[in-house]
Every structure is written in C-alpha cells, then in structure tokens.
Amino acid sequence: MGSLDHLGAIVRDLGAGAARWEKLGFLLSPVSRQRGKMPGRDEDGPWATANRCAILQRGYLELIGVVEPALYNPWTKFLDRFEGLHLLALRVPDADAAFAELSRRTGTLNAPVQRARNLDVDGVEKTMRFRNIFSRDEAYPEGRYIVLEHQTPEYLWQPRYQTHPNGAIALEAALVCAEDVPAQRKRLETLVGAPALEGTDGVQRFAPAGGGRIELHGAEAFAARYGWKPPALPAFAGVEVRFADRERAAAHMEDNGIPVQRGEEWLVAPAHTNGFMLRLAP
C-alpha cells in the first residue's frame, strides 16, 4: 500500500519543539496554522495548533504544536498519552482506489476527505491540495494512520526547504513498539497489504510497495535494544533518517550539544527529538 510518506510528532509548545529539531540540524518550513471541524459549529474554524515540517527528498517529518492554547485543540487526547509520534502516513497515487482496496480488508478507515492549505511558493500564494483517509482512533491504539494522496506535491516539496544543515535526505523507516505483537502485526498487515518479514534480530519489517519500511518491535526487546520505550503502548516509537553523510550529520548534532550514541546503531535519545528515538541510517 503506497510508500512511507511522513511521521508526525505532537507537542505542547510548537516553538520549543521546533527549536529542538532545528538544533538537530533540520530546516523547518514556515509556521502553518491548522483549522478544521469545531465542536458545536457547522463551519470550520482555527485550532489551537500549527505545524512545521522537515521536508526531505523522500518523505518528511511533521511537527504539530500548540500556538494558541485558548482555542480548540483536536490533539488533546494524543498529548494526554505523551508528547511524541502519533501520526504515520502512507502515500498513494489515488485515494479512492486505495480506500476501495482497504475497505475489502477492514472497516476501520474513514472515506477520503479533501483538504487544502494555502502556502507561499516562490513569493506567490498557492493552494496545496491533498486527500486523506484517516484511521478510526478507537481501532488503532498506537496512533493515527493517514493514507494520503498528494494532488499538488510540488508545492510541498519545494527545493528551498530540502537543504538541511545536517544533510538529511530521506525518511527510511518508522519504528513501532507494542506489547501485544501479534495484534499489532495484524493491524499493520491489514494497512500495508503484505505480510511482515521477520529478521534474525526478531524485528518484523513491513515494506510498502512504494518504498520505506515499518519496523515492529516487541516492547521489552525495544527497551533492551534502545534503553527506552514510549510511556504508553502500543506506540510509534522512532524514525530512521538517511543523511548525505552520517558522520557529518552526527558531528553537526554533537557540535550543537546533542549526544549521538555511536554503536551498532547511531542514535539520538528522545529527550532531544520531541519524544522519539532517532536512528541515523548507515
């Protein structure tokens, strides 16, 4: 089912969260206010939150955070779990075709909805359009899945946002952590449309047809391997990012005072990333 498109972290303070990502060496897109359905109102309205993104050559990382606390916040239940990763998106060429295929496997996804957002493209305001299929939160305790059709991808993947001080170039993998591995595996197999391949390390890996990976880790094995696990399970627990030069990326982070664990895997701890494990691809 498509390709790994992006992962989204949600934090209580967008400014503080953005500063952490910038310290890691990610260049972030401008602040974009969020709006949508409001309780007790028929028309859409402004939310308490906004987002900024680290746009990579392949995929991106989204940061959602509170900017106006007095307004309605649709992300409260996620923040009540923890600050960290709560969104995992797969990209497809046609949302209607994807929904038809997914509906043959499960009834836990909502029909595609049209979305639009205005943004600056080389000094001209353009309307970015996309269609989202959202998972139903009650069926997916680990977080929210989005199956996404980009209708104007050129407005999101602007070259000026793809040159990062740390040399980040691609989103390679999402790391999922669960105590009930069989149940989590079943949910992922249903979404991806293909079985997992279990490695010699016990990690179950899903490979969406269009690219990227989703890794499923058992909770205790994840904690033993990384020295940390999310405060609530199941959860989206980490990301793997590829850099043009891993050594230079790590040095950039260390020069900014961020420790990089260099062992079999190169890692940055959740305290520096907004609540998830960052793995630097070899």
Task: Locate each region found by the language model.
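N-terminal beta-loop-helix "entrance" segment that forms/cooperates
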Residues: M38-E43
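Glyoxalase I/VOC metalloenzyme domain signal
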Residues: M1-D5, A9-S29, G45-R115, D120-P282
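A short beta-strand-loop structural module common to alpha/beta enzyme folds
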Residues: S29-G36
